[in-house]
Amino acid sequence: MSNEFITFEKISRESWKTLHQKAKALLTQEELKSITSLNDNISINDVIDIYLPLINLIQVYKIAQENLSFSKSLFLKKDIQLRPFIIGISGSVAVGKSTTSRLLQLLLSRTHPNSQVELVTTDGFLYPNQFLIEQGLLNRKGFPESYNMELLLDFLDSIKNGQTAFAPVYSHDIYDIIPNKKQSFNNPDFLIVEGINVFQNQQNNRLYMSDYFDFSIYIDADSSHIETWYIERFLSILKLAKRDPHNYYAQYAQLPRSEAIAFARNVWKTVNLENLEKFIEPTRNRAELILHKSADHKIDEIYLKK
């Protein structure tokens, strides 16, 4: 990797897995399968080798955050205010962010049984399709200008200050925000924020989403591998959409396989690859930790900020 990573320490998988004492995976194979995204691939060994050491590392950051908050309260002669520990997770479409986010949520819940661990995706902060159509932005969906960043930053500010906050809910089945549906958050102990844009800054040059994060992860992989995963996932979505005529993807479900692959490859190249190269990948050095995946979805290298 380039000088972009000069501030990171590279750790091999073999070295990383020694940073946690051998233990059970804290979840069953069935539970792991239930939280794994379409066409993603993760094993119990991955949980033990990669994610249990990661949980240990998050605990290190959490203790440091609590100690700093305590020291600040003493300095300012104020009562200590307990704040949620916020984890940001970013990476390309189809790289496996959702699997990682759900797995971390489950593992944190198991290792902190008395804590409330919540998960929110930034998809809910996309503008509704009708607004995007009116603004001529529907073909830019997923790009920075398609997100209501003011609403997202207000949400994070409320969370960080221990206030009850509400997030819109996005449905991939209808490819749109669900009208009048909100997800509520009441001062969780941990909040995982997952999305392609969590390290980006749009319009407001003085404030980044990452300013609210106590820990952050970027899921990385070669773009040619992500393209393959994206196409495989698209084909799996079409199979499911055949059973539901109301699904947004039902309109593509009857395409011959070759045409469906060609369509997905075109969307990847004209939308997702451009978004990755221009707006997502350039932000990865803002993460505290980079998890790099090989062609088989397995994490082979870890980069930890020095």
Swiss-Prot record:
Q: Does the keyword Transferase apply?
A: yes
Q: What molecular functions are annotated in GO for this chain?
A: ATP binding; pantothenate kinase activity
Major localization class? cytoplasm
Which residues bind ATP per the record?
91-98
Q: Name one GO biological process term.
A: coenzyme A biosynthetic process
Which family is this sequence assigned to?
Belongs to the prokaryotic pantothenate kinase family.
This protein is called: Pantothenate kinase
Q: Which gene does this sequence derive from?
A: coaA
